Design a protein with these regions (language model features):
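Membrane helical hairpin/interfacial module
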Residues: 2-11, 15-70
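Short, compositionally biased low-complexity segments
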Residues: 8-10, 78-81
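Extended ligand-binding clefts on enzyme/binding-domain cores
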Residues: 50-77, 83-85, 93-181
Length: 181
């Protein structure tokens, strides 16, 4: 039996755990342990340029593909990165468990190569195929509501940053498309 987990939904779960700790509904060590398990899972999971699949078989740490295509989800990855970076800020106590969590979250974030998934005009691809021949008809990530956080993560990356103009280019691309339609 497979246990399918969603990358994007896991981001919401991480944030809920933090809110639960803050409001004293969830024990801090319980939340820390769960988020630690998630980061261990992500560090050993298959990815492409640091981008995760939308779904995984939790027992095997392998992607669960829809429509038999190996596709990795840029927005789902951005959502879980955001949640993990918030957790990294929240779990800031000076003890080994929290230091270890912060270090692993940094590892997950640092391995995302935003430059490798950007087009020549610095627009991020919304999906990323495992095999290049399956990476056809891939629309750029330019949705005004959902793209902003992804582009902010990409422009703030310590090693593989996109230029800060990339977000503005994505917005312009979206308006240009609307104007042409």
């Amino acid at each position: 039996n497979k246990v399918i987990v969603s990358t994007k939904e896991t981001a919401g779960a991480i944030l809920s755990l933090i809110v639960g700790v803050h409001n004293e509904y969830v024990n801090r060590s319980t939340a820390l342990n769960r988020i630690s398990k998630i980061t261990f899972f992500l560090l050993k999971s298959q990815h492409r340029h640091g981008i995760f699949a939308a779904y995984y078989d939790a027992r095997k740490s392998i992607p669960e593909y829809r429509n038999e295509l190996a596709i990795y989800d840029v927005q789902a990855t951005a959502a879980i990165l955001e949640a993990l970076l918030i957790a990294r800020q929240y779990f800031k106590e000076d003890n080994e468990a929290e230091k270890d969590l912060r270090a692993r979250i940094t590892q997950v974030y640092d391995r995302v190569n935003w430059q490798a998934i950007a087009s020549s005009d610095n627009l991020l691809r919304s999906k990323l195929a495992l095999l290049d021949e399956n990476d056809y008809n891939n629309a750029p990530l330019s949705n005004l509501d959902e793209a902003i956080n992804t582009y902010l993560l990409a422009s703030g990356h310590p090693k593989y940053a996109l230029p800060s103009s990339a977000y503005f280019d994505a917005v312009y691309h979206q308006f240009k498309k609307i104007k042409q339609d």
